[in-house]
Design a protein with these regions (language model features):
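A common structural microfeature
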Residues: 14-16, 63, 80
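Catalytic domains of carbohydrate-active enzymes, especially glycoside hydrolases
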Residues: 65-86, 289, 293, 346
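Glycine-rich, proline-tolerant flexible connector loops at the mouths of alpha/beta enzymes
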Residues: 85-98
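Active-site region of glycoside hydrolase catalytic domains
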Residues: 2-50, 74, 93-95, 103-376
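Generic alpha-helix structural propensity
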Residues: 61-68, 76, 85, 101-108, ...
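Active-site mouth loops of central-metabolism enzymes
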Residues: 51-65, 139-142
């Protein structure tokens, strides 16, 4: 019989041992109590987009079983729970009329989290744009930022007095590049200009949302969560080192530079000027948008070589031989430390949360194996 142990008492006293979810991934009940259609509802129903046409219609049924789920977290000794609010539950059409039953659900959820002694971290957007806003152009359209700010205000007026930690966006890169560049996630579009315009709308939306957070949840700490790339040159060649820095511009500084410096990387104007958005006065304000903390999602590094035949002259290559997860992702724990240090040094970030980290395996329940978790 195999016994595993995890001693959380060894962690610093201000370390929050937590778990995270996203509304569409766990809630189910997609048509319950007035919820509107999201881009993921549509994407999952588009033939060929999702393996075996799986969808989030039921998922973990968290919408109906949230009390049981919170009880399990308490039993595990979890200290913090990061959840997301589903925009289509609050504004079924993205803007206009509010659905009060959606607010009621998250009101009960937050109270339930607090009642069990957990610290709630609320993510305002985890990829589930209301479909009606996508039908009008989606994130590439400037006015979506204004609708997002109104949605954020509505949520914060109801929940803000009980939320110590608030996240504006989860993984801007995935929202923009997977949604509008390579089409691998909802809404499944493929256009570089739309991608960069979506990024600008999202960057502007973060600033507007931070204004609303300061106004309606003044006691909260607020930030953003990014799956920042640790870009490593595949060789020691100077051109590959340049390519690795360029990948950081392409995937990460597109969001980091506006957040902390109020501008976009110069390399993007040099390589793809035709795709870059118009910037109006006040769009990118690093004072108003400055986060209280930075949430980092880290899973694996990316390895890069120069490729002058491409508009952005680089190419991703396979990681060196070594251990991999069941998803084929390389396992490089030291990359987390390296990435944290890079971000600290480049942007003077003082407070981090590791908001996602881990690995996927084809696990099966084992009757001869168990874990003991020692909590503070």
């Amino acid at each position: 019989m195999t016994h595993h142990s995890l001693d959380l008492k060894a962690l610093p006293k201000d370390f929050l041992w937590g778990v995270a979810t996203a509304a569409y991934q766990i809630e189910g009940a997609v048509w319950a109590n007035g919820r509107g259609c999201s881009i993921w509802d549509t994407y999952c129903r588009t033939p060929g987009k999702v393996y075996e046409a799986h969808n989030g219609d039921v998922a973990c049924d968290h919408y109906h079983r949230w009390e049981e789920d919170l009880d399990l977290m308490k039993e595990l000794g979890i200290a913090s729970y990061r959840f997301s609010v589903a925009w289509p539950r609050i504004f079924p059409r993205g803007c206009g009329a509010v659905e009060p039953r959606g607010l009621d659900f998250y009101d009960r959820l937050v109270d339930g989290i607090l009642r069990r002694g957990l610290v709630p971290m609320c993510t305002l957007y985890h990829w589930d744009l209301p479909q009606e806003l996508e039908d009008r152009g989606g994130w590439p359209e400037r006015d979506v930022a204004d609708h997002f700010a109104d949605y954020a205000e509505t949520v914060l007026r109801r929940l803000g007095d009980r939320l110590p930690l608030i996240v504006t966006f989860n993984e801007p890169y995935c929202i923009c590049f997977n949604g509008y560049y390579n089409g691998s996630q909802a809404p499944g579009r493929k256009n570089l200009r739309l991608t960069h315009h979506a990024a600008h709308t999202l960057n502007r939306a973060h600033v507007l949302a931070m204004d609303r957070i300061r106004a309606y949840a003044p006691g909260a700490k607020a930030g953003i969560v990014m799956n920042t790339t640790l870009a490593l040159p595949a060789t020691d060649r100077p051109e590959d080192r340049v390519a690795a820095e360029l990948l950081m511009d392409w995937e990460d500084r597109l969001f980091l530079d506006p957040l902390f410096r109020g501008r976009y990387p110069e390399s993007l104007y040099r390589h793809v000027p035709e795709s870059m958005p118009e910037i109006r006065e006040g769009d990118l304000d690093p004072v108003r948008g400055k986060p209280d903390f930075f949430g980092l999602n880290y899973y694996f590094p990316s390895y890069v070589v120069a490729d002058p035949t491409r508009p952005i002259p680089l190419r991703l290559v396979d990681a060196p031989a070594g251990p991999r997860t069941a998803m084929g992702w390389c396992i490089v724990p030291s990359g987390l430390t390296e990435l944290l240090l890079r971000l600290r040094d480049e942007y003077a970030i003082e407070t981090f949360y590791i908001t996602e980290n881990g690995s996927a395996w084809n696990d099966v329940p084992e009757g001869d194996s168990w874990w003991t978790i020692s909590t503070p």
